């Protein structure tokens, strides 16, 4: 958002001879809230272009809403869910960024190169992590890797004890696709429980929150 505001400011608020006004709205990563925010921007504020959202589930919801507003151009923000553009696409919803599966290319081979022949998945239960896990497994399983267990956890989870208790002894590593505070909470609880499995991280796992985490488990990601 700050980048867009800076770009408009540097051009004196005018692009191609047109005065540009930026109107902001928040969604808190909830698809219903995102659609309500989009509805206000489009139907009340009369925006010509809507850019956003960030989260995968939000992106799918906004894509579906865009079909009811053909006069408005929708540009995907950071939402990396494949279904925003690959499933029932909308003619006025455009993606210029990569999606979750693409960001995981190469991680499956890296896991096999490290000798991780069996990997458990721990990921948040919504669209973007689904894409991340799919991207990892497509390559990893093709190379002979096995995923004996996938644990899908709620976004914003606080207690990972039941997931930690289910980690099989015979897996070589964990694929962790948790973002921000969720990742830090899991790493803290796993380390406190004596967990010692090496970890692979999704693109949302290595955020600044996780990089600032001081525990030993961070260093194994």
Enumerate the predicted regions with their spans.
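Short, polar/charged alpha-helical segment
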Residues: 1-16, 135-141
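Extracellular/periplasmic periplasmic-binding protein-like sensory domains
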Residues: 190-221
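A short helix->loop->beta-strand "cap" motif at the edges of active sites that frequently abuts
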Residues: 69-73, 145, 195-198, 219
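Periplasmic-binding protein-like
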Residues: 41-55, 73-77, 118-123, 171-180, ...
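Beta-alpha junction/loop-to-helix N-cap segments that form part of ligand/metal-binding clefts
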Residues: 10-84, 96, 154-158
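Short glycine-enriched loops at secondary-structure junctions
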Residues: 28, 78-82, 125-128, 205-207
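Extracellular/periplasmic Venus flytrap/periplasmic-binding protein
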Residues: 33-36, 82-85, 91-194
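Short, well-ordered alpha-helical microsegments
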Residues: 58-60, 104, 183-184, 207-211
